[in-house]
């Protein structure tokens, strides 16, 4: 009987050590997730500032588009795509952390069940309390990760909407630039025709 109890206690200690390792891994994942959340918030602020920046620089872009329209449009499109790509990478990383936490929680429940079965002959109340405490904490952490994932989805949706609006503005600027060039070409041709008519009239007057 003493051998059986000693074996049960040894198994319990081993399981508790594994639980501590899982807790440490979960805390590390939560820290990484918090860092991702801060980056997401920074990205959202940057995304919100984009429309104001484009409104302030709209007139400057219109003037500059007369000289270097293709270069400017290419630069703006590259910056927007880089922001969207970074947002998507953050979102994927966040989902990977969420999956890892859920896997840890599943293993944690399995080990706690094994511990409870092995300790039927021993008072299980402290183990139950520890299980309830750790389970509630890890589930709370998973809820936080889910909330962060939802924030990321909304941020990516906002970025996509802003990208479409900016694309429309850039297309409008290209059209205006083309029309201005056509007007300039027509004005130049008209001026040249008037100059030639004036020269012909002067030549006839001299004769």
Swiss-Prot record:
Q: Which GO terms describe its cellular component?
A: cytosol; FAR/SIN/STRIPAK complex
Keyword Repeat assigned to the entry: answer is no
Q: Which SUPFAM superfamilies match?
A: Spectrin repeat
What function is annotated for this protein? Physiological suppressor of IKK-epsilon and TBK1 that plays an inhibitory role in virus- and TLR3-triggered IRF3. Inhibits TLR3-mediated activation of interferon-stimulated response elements (ISRE) and the IFN-beta promoter. May act by disrupting the interactions of IKBKE or TBK1 with TICAM1/TRIF, IRF3 and RIGI. Does not inhibit NF-kappa-B activation pathways. Associates with the striatin-interacting phosphatase and kinase (STRIPAK) core complex, forming the extended (SIKE1:SLMAP)STRIPAK complex.
Name its species. Homo sapiens
Coiled-coil boundaries = 70-102, 162-193
Q: Which GO terms describe its molecular function?
A: protein kinase binding; protein-macromolecule adaptor activity; small GTPase binding
| Protein name per UniProt | Suppressor of IKBKE 1
Is this entry keyworded Isomerase?
A: no
């Amino acid at each position: 009987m003493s051998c059986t109890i000693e074996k049960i206690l040894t198994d319990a200690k081993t399981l508790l050590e594994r639980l501590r390792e899982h807790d440490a891994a979960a805390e590390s994942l939560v820290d990484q997730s918090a860092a991702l959340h801060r980056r997401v918030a920074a990205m959202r602020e940057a995304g919100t500032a984009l429309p104001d920046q484009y409104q302030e620089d709209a007139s400057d872009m219109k003037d500059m588009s007369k000289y270097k329209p293709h270069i400017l449009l290419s630069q703006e499109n590259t910056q927007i795509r880089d922001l969207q790509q970074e947002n998507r990478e953050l979102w994927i990383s966040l989902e990977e952390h969420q999956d890892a936490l859920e896997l840890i929680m599943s293993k944690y429940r399995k080990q706690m069940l094994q511990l409870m079965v092995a300790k039927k002959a021993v008072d299980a109340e402290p183990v139950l309390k520890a299980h309830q405490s750790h389970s509630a904490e890890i589930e709370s952490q998973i809820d936080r990760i889910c909330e962060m994932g939802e924030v990321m989805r909304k941020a990516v949706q906002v970025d996509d909407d802003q990208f479409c609006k900016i694309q429309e503005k850039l297309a409008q600027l290209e059209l205006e630039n083309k029309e201005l060039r056509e007007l300039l070409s027509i004005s130049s041709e008209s001026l040249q025709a008037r100059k030639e008519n004036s020269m012909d009239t002067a030549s006839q007057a001299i004769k």
